[in-house]
Amino acid sequence: VTVDCSGYPKPDCTLESFPLCGSDNQTYSNKCAFCNAAVERNVTLRHLGEC
């Protein structure tokens, strides 16, 4: 599973809840929060859902 993070980082994310687990073992609340971290800190997707 991959997530398209083109167009990120974004200054504001919605409060939409769609958890994603990052390679840093942190649960991100949604795609926007995950993609901001992916772009800024080179985090990759571990799996969909909470870590």
Swiss-Prot record:
<dbReference type="GO" id="GO:0004867">
    <property type="term" value="F:serine-type endopeptidase inhibitor activity"/>
</dbReference>
<dbReference type="InterPro" id="IPR050159">
    <property type="entry name" value="Kazal-type_SerProtInhib"/>
</dbReference>
<feature type="disulfide bond">
    <location>
        <begin position="5"/>
        <end position="35"/>
    </location>
</feature>
<feature type="domain" description="Kazal-like">
    <location>
        <begin position="3"/>
        <end position="51"/>
    </location>
</feature>
<dbReference type="GO" id="GO:0005576">
    <property type="term" value="C:extracellular region"/>
</dbReference>
<dbReference type="InterPro" id="IPR002350">
    <property type="entry name" value="Kazal_dom"/>
</dbReference>
<dbReference type="InterPro" id="IPR036058">
    <property type="entry name" value="Kazal_dom_sf"/>
</dbReference>
<keyword id="KW-0325">Glycoprotein</keyword>
<protein>
    <recommendedName>
        <fullName>Ovomucoid</fullName>
    </recommendedName>
</protein>
<dbReference type="Pfam" id="PF00050">
    <property type="entry name" value="Kazal_1"/>
</dbReference>
<feature type="disulfide bond">
    <location>
        <begin position="21"/>
        <end position="51"/>
    </location>
</feature>
<feature type="site" description="Reactive bond 3">
    <location>
        <begin position="15"/>
        <end position="16"/>
    </location>
</feature>
<keyword id="KW-1015">Disulfide bond</keyword>
<keyword id="KW-0646">Protease inhibitor</keyword>
<keyword id="KW-0722">Serine protease inhibitor</keyword>
<keyword id="KW-0677">Repeat</keyword>
<keyword id="KW-0964">Secreted</keyword>
<feature type="glycosylation site" description="N-linked (GlcNAc...) asparagine">
    <location>
        <position position="42"/>
    </location>
</feature>
<feature type="disulfide bond">
    <location>
        <begin position="13"/>
        <end position="32"/>
    </location>
</feature>
